[in-house]
UniProtKB/Swiss-Prot annotation:
Its main location: cytoplasm. GO terms for cellular component: cytoplasm. Residues 325-360 are annotated as: Disordered. It is found in: Cytoplasm. This is Protein NDRG2. Keywords: Cytoplasm, Developmental protein, Differentiation, Neurogenesis, Wnt signaling pathway. The gene is ndrg2.
Length: 360
C-alpha cells in the first residue's frame, strides 16, 4: 500500500459571514440554476424561466408581467431583493413571458393576430402541464394580473393564492376607448405605455427608474410586439366580478397598488368586488406605478405574511418592518375591527387568515 500523503487545502474564498453578501451569493447561484423552456400553446410559444426546483407539497410561484416589459424588467428587482432569497429557496419560481415579449424574440410580421388576454390566460394550463405543477401562487402585474384573475375564474382548483398588482378587472368603456383613440393621435405608443406603467408625478419627475424604462421601451427592437400585447390589454373584457355572486376569486388574494398610481381607483374598485375574508389590500406610499420595482422590501414583507397565512414558511424570520407593521381592516362589511399584521401569520392548518388592509 502506498504511503498516504498529507495534502493542505487552502480556501480561496472563505465562508461569508456578512448576511448581505450571503444573500447576494445565493441570488447569483439561483441565476446560474435558471432553466429556460419554450412551450408550445394553441396561442403561440411562451418562454418560461425556472428558478429552483419543485418542492413536495408546495405550490409553484408563477409570475406574469405587464405590457411594455418582459419578466426581467418587471420582476428582477423584486426577486433579486435580498429577503426574497428566503422565499425563493422554499418554492420553485416560474416566470412566464407572453408570446413575443421576451428579449431576443422574433418580430411579428404586420397583420399578425396576437392572442387576447383571455387566450393568454389559457396558455397557463399548458405551462403547468408541461412543468407538472399541480398548484400555484400567481403574481401578476397590470395585464399579467388580469390574466391570472381570468385564469383563476376557470381553474380555481389549481390556484392556492394570488398577488395582483395594478389590476383593472373592467373592460374599457366607450369614453375610455374614445380618449385612448384621441391620445393615440398625439402620443406615441411608448408614451402611452409609460403612462400606463408610471404615475404623472413619476413621469414629470423623470426619476432614474422612469428614464431606465423609457430608454428600454424606446430602444427595444420589439416595440411592435409590445404594441400587440398593449392592444390586447386595451381590448380586455370585463371580468364581471361580484362580491357574494357566482363570479369571484375564491382563493386568498393580495391586491397591491401604489398611492396615487394610475390604477389606484381600479384596484380599490376590485377590492370592493372580492370576498373581504379572503382579500388583502395593500396600498403602498412612495411607490408610484410599479411597487415591485420601487418598493421591493415592503412588498417582500407583505408577501411573506401572505404565504405564512396560507400555512407556508411558518418559521421564517421576520424583520422589524413585518413585526411592527400595524394595520386596520377596511370598514366595509365585517372588516371594521383592528389588529396587527402579525396576527395574520398565526394561522396553522386552518383556513388562511387574510392580511388586513394596509397603507405603508
Amino acid at each position: 500500500m502506498s504511503e498516504l500523503q498529507e495534502v493542505q487545502i487552502t480556501e480561496d474564498n472563505p465562508l461569508l459571514q456578512d448576511p448581505l453578501k450571503a444573500a447576494e451569493l445565493a441570488a447569483k447561484l439561483l441565476q446560474v440554476q435558471e432553466q429556460k423552456h419554450s412551450i408550445e400553446t394553441p396561442y403561440g410559444v411562451v418562454t418560461v424561466t425556472i428558478q429552483g426546483t419543485p418542492k413536495p407539497k408546495r405550490p409553484a410561484i408563477v409570475t406574469f408581467h405587464d405590457v411594455g416589459m418582459d419578466h426581467k424588467m418587471c420582476f428582477d428587482t423584486l426577486f433579486k431583493y435580498e429577503d426574497m432569497c428566503e422565499i425563493v429557496k422554499n418554492f420553485v419560481v416560474c416566470h412566464i413571458d407572453a408570446p413575443g415579449q421576451e428579449e431576443g424574440s422574433a418580430v411579428y410580421p404586420p397583420g399578425y393576430q396576437y392572442p387576447s388576454l383571455d387566450q393568454l390566460a389559457e396558455t397557463i394550463p399548458c405551462v403547468l402541464q408541461y412543468l407538472n405543477f399541480p398548484s400555484i401562487i400567481g403574481i401578476g402585474v397590470g395585464a399579467g394580473a388580469y390574466i391570472f384573475a381570468k385564469y383563476t375564474l376557470s381553474h380555481a382548483n389549481t390556484v392556492e393564492g394570488l398577488v395582483l398588482i395594478n389590476i383593472d378587472p373592467n373592460a374599457k368603456g366607450w369614453m375610455d376607448w374614445a380618449a385612448q383613440k384621441l391620445t393615440g393621435l398625439t402620443q406615441s405608443i411608448s408614451d402611452m405605455m409609460l403612462g400606463h406603467l408610471f404615475s404623472a408625478e413619476e413621469l414629470s419627475g423623470n426619476s432614474d427608474v422612469v428614464r431606465q424604462y423609457k430608454a428600454s421601451i424606446l430602444n427595444s427592437p420589439l416595440i411592435s410586439n409590445y404594441q400587440l400585447y398593449w392592444n390586447s390589454y386595451n381590448s380586455r373584457r370585463d371580468l364581471n366580478l361580484e362580491r357574494g355572486g357566482g363570479v369571484t376569486l375564491k382563493c386568498p388574494v393580495m391586491l397591491v397598488v401604489g398611492d396615487q398610481a394610475p390604477h389606484e381607483d381600479a384596484v380599490v374598485e376590485c377590492n370592493s368586488k372580492l370576498d373581504p375574508t379572503q382579500t388583502s389590500f395593500l396600498k403602498m406610499a412612495d411607490s408610484g406605478g410599479q411597487p415591485q420595482i420601487t418598493q421591493p422590501g415592503k412588498l417582500t414583507e407583505a408577501f411573506k405574511y401572505f404565504v405564512q397565512g396560507m400555512g407556508y414558511m411558518a418559521s421564517s424570520c421576520m424583520t422589524r418592518l413585518s413585526r411592527s407593521r400595524t394595520a386596520s381592516l377596511s370598514s366595509e362589511g365585517n372588516r371594521s375591527r383592528s389588529r396587527t399584521l402579525s396576527q395574520s401569520s398565526e394561522s396553522g392548518g386552518g383556513p388562511p387568515a387574510p392580511l388586513a388592509e394596509v397603507t405603508c
